[in-house]
Amino acid sequence: MGQKINPLGFRLGATQGHHSLWFAQPKNYSEDLQEDQKIRDCIKNYIKKNMKIFSSVEGIACIEIQKRIDLIQVIIYMGFPKLLIEHQKIEELQMNIQKELNSVNRKLNMAITRIANPYGHPNILAEFIAGQLKNRVSFRKAMKKAIELTEQAGTKGIQIQIAGRIDGKEIARVEWIREGRVPLQTIKAKIDYCSYTVRTIYGALGIKIWIFVDE
């Protein structure tokens, strides 16, 4: 039976790049890795806390961290960056992260990049499906709506999988749907992937999304 490898790790160096770009001494490596996780968690928690009530999608596609001796550069790729830009929240977020890291001799720089087609990115799409499932929308309806949104974003194919106690059924099961082509075996095919856990009143559901972006 074929083993299912993570599509992003499988394509590293071919069509995928790293989201953390820095070098460290072996003895400091784990500390730097934990620091990266702290930064990512801090950003996600801040946006979740300050999110508008009506928007169920945070819209973070990915967070890129670049480090030098005296500088930490953080680039947040967002689908809907209004929240941070309009209310000057980015300075507040920057101060929060600086407090969390407690690094005096390093400057922290933050930038926000807007994504052209937010629903062409699996993380944002997974958040959309999670919001639908939390509002007790039928999983098939949520999947079909998600596929419509990605088609508008101009992708070549998509596969969505939801696993768990779907619709509150006693027995957990896996449901999936595919539209277009999703060549997982081809390394040169640019495939975006994400796995996301959503907590519903019936328990946790796992959402996995593969999007075929380009050859």
Swiss-Prot record:
One of its GO terms (biological process) is translation. Keywords: Chloroplast, Plastid, Ribonucleoprotein, Ribosomal protein, RNA-binding, rRNA-binding. CDD domains: KH-II_30S_S3. The keyword Endoplasmic reticulum does not apply. Pfam families: Ribosomal_S3_C. Its main location: plastid. It comes from the Eukaryota. SUPFAM superfamilies: Prokaryotic type KH domain (KH-domain type II), Ribosomal protein S3 C-terminal domain. One of its GO terms (cellular component) is cytosolic small ribosomal subunit. InterPro entries: KH_dom-like_a/b, KH_sf_prok-type, Ribosomal_S3_C_sf, Ribosomal_uS3_bac-typ, Ribosomal_uS3_C, Ribosomal_uS3_CS. One of its GO terms (molecular function) is structural constituent of ribosome. Signal peptide: none annotated. Residues 43-116 form the KH type-2 domain. The keyword Ribonucleoprotein applies. It is found in: Plastid, Chloroplast. Belongs to the universal ribosomal protein uS3 family. Part of the 30S ribosomal subunit. NCBIfam families: rpsC_bact (TIGR01009). This is Small ribosomal subunit protein uS3c.
